[in-house]
């Protein structure tokens, strides 16, 4: 659907989705619904296990609770609307589109800085184990968890305000399955250069600052691990970091591939695959990454289940 609105912004957008084939749409609906249900179960389960087991009331699992909350929210911002579009109407209102873009950017930025906070926690645990409880005080933990949300809100607010000043009256067709910056910028009838530069600075600074702090933390962690004499000690220290490193690698590689490039290099097929990965797949992977290799979480699940059985 195309239409001119006499210099008036469109009232709604049309999300073209991933495919026009009804058979493939139904298959994607079933797949995405299954992934979303597993995402809900995994992240809510992780939050509940950490809350219910006192032995997991530590800074590491405090941050992991918020990571699960962000992943759950992150997926909820995109997946339900995507599922609805696959079955029924693919319309989204102008306000709804920008609201989706705001929360998506807010949660994405918050997760970047939360991963930095988690890296600092691992640095304190491995490099200063005797002073860990003093370093990771309640006040510092609250600061490290509040900061990502505040920065995420500010960055997302600036992003959405700058995007809302653009005009969209030539076309309302978004060649994507959700409201993201690149395909929406492509619809604008006005010059987007300043907006693109601003978004590039926001996204670039977020990725650079968070990646720098994560990298710096792991450089110190690596030097500390190399100084450990026993092989078992090295393996134990490394095992506490491998889950976080894997999560960071997957999350940042897709973000950098998608956002740190000029709009002219936007590729519909490639970018949609990357978007599916970090909006739908990554939120379901994190609970698996942080629990399957974690004996403390497994033991906590057993303890919670045993307490439930004993209480009957």
Curated annotation (Swiss-Prot):
Similarity section: Belongs to the G-protein coupled receptor 1 family.
Subcellular location(s) of the protein: Cell membrane
GO cellular component: plasma membrane
Membrane-side (Extracellular) residue stretches: 1-26, 77-99, 161-197, 259-271
One GO biological process term: G protein-coupled receptor signaling pathway
Alphabetically ordered keywords of this record: Cell membrane, Disulfide bond, G-protein coupled receptor, Glycoprotein, Membrane, Olfaction, Receptor, Sensory transduction, Transducer, Transmembrane, Transmembrane helix
Transmembrane segments: 27-47, 56-76, 100-120, 140-160, 198-217, 238-258, 272-292
Protein name (database record): Olfactory receptor 8H2
Function, as annotated: Odorant receptor.
Disulfide bonds: 97-189
Major location (coarse): membrane
Record: glycosylation sites: 6
Originating species: Homo sapiens
GN (gene name): OR8H2
SUPFAM superfamilies: Family A G protein-coupled receptor-like
Membrane topology summary: Multi-pass membrane protein
Cytoplasmic compartment residues: 48-55, 121-139, 218-237, 293-312
GO molecular function, one term: olfactory receptor activity
